[in-house]
Amino acid sequence: MNFNSESAIFTSSKDFNILDFSQMNKYLIKKKIKYLIHVAGLSRPMSIHENNISKSINLNIIGTANIVKVCKKNNIKLIYISTNYVYPGVKGNYNENSPLKPFNNYAWSKLGGEASVQLYKNSLILRVCMTDFPFTHKKAITGAKTSFMFNKYVAKIIPLILDEKGILNIGGKKREIINFANKFSNKRIASIHLNKIKNYPKDTSLNINKLKKLLIEKKLNISDYIK
């Protein structure tokens, strides 16, 4: 697919409420949508998924199931943004076939969304390890590793893989979180050790060989996307 910013439609919950099947169906028909990138949902703060499980279930599981149904009805390709948190977060280097074991309610809610997407074969699940650009946090963790990629690079990759199906990990190089923060920040980031954070995973890093292979097949420079 040839994709550019002019061909994309960015909507809001007012016009496209994922809990309102009828509204979504009318919108998709009116706009003649061929691809739907599902980024709506509930993420931060993580505590909300512990304190308000009804909201977490409604937005991340039921809302996603509604999107699957409306995409199926209209034969629309669905791209679902999931998270690397569905993996156990113990040994790292998780590939798309690694066993899954979410470590918090947010991750369980995203895996619940994945379950409904898996029923629809015209779909692509992206397990993304992403953070905001620029790095917005005042502190970064020592003793924990991951595969952060800034959201601006994820946004560059997604249009290139719209026609893929199945599951794909998206992330950057494996690094200790504090090292990532200091490498890409224009100011020194304070550190906090993993042991001081309750229930934080030790290593959520991703194996991104499949992503690299796709970029190479498209004759793209990996270093333009994976930092």
Question: What would you call each of these model-derived segments?
Answer:
Residues 21-59, 70:
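NAD(P)H-binding glycine-rich loop region in Rossmannoid oxidoreductase-like domains
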Residues 19, 35, 51, 55-66, ...:
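Glycine-rich NAD(P)-binding loop of the Rossmann-fold in SDR/ketoreductase-type enzymes
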Residues 101-129:
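Active-site Tyr-X1-5-Lys
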Residues 11-22:
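Rossmann-fold cofactor-recognition segment
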Residues 65-101:
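Conserved Rossmann-fold NAD(P)-dependent oxidoreductase catalytic core, especially the SDR/UDP-sugar
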Residues 157, 161-208:
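Mid/C-terminal beta-alpha module of Rossmann-like enzyme folds, strongest
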Residues 135-163:
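Substrate-positioning beta->alpha
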